[in-house]
């Protein structure tokens, strides 16, 4: 059995799950690139379009997710390099048991929706500039957009962006993009969620909560981070 959202799900609820990958690796002395084409089927399919871990969703046991994923790095010279990630995923075949989230309706009350199909695009770019033998400046720019079509006939759009600037102290910047470092960083995060014509059903004689909008969230953070990767 598997525990899901506080309830115990049997293997019959979850169904089989499969993952198939086709990958292309290309590399050289100053670059590396990986492109993968992925197909997820069954109860692990719902999570891949929302960026989660290997959870299992009973409502996704007949679903399919198709994803193309590209990541890599390029080192232009000993002072400048860039890492990147681009991903697009499309999921369909969920049943109404699969719940993906909630939005505010016009009455400022949360309403759950059931996913029929969903799309997710995300991209991250991370340029690094060497300043001295032991210091470097790293920027990270990331964004995503997720579009969900619901069984209720509505469209939920969610966007998010994250911008980080970090000053790094490292034993040796000869390893430009990686290596242990102490990072002093500032990060700005922004996200919003919008539903088009949500809640057209009649509830207590009231119809149509058109163009409901969940409040925009944003935050700025400062911090220090120790990193030990090579």
Predicted regions and their residues:
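C-terminal beta-signal and adjacent terminal beta-strands/loops
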Residues: 188-202
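Extended hydrophobic secondary-structure segments that form protein cores and membrane-embedded regions
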Residues: 1-3, 36, 180-189
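Outer-membrane beta-barrel "beta-signal"
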Residues: 165, 169-171, 208, 213-230
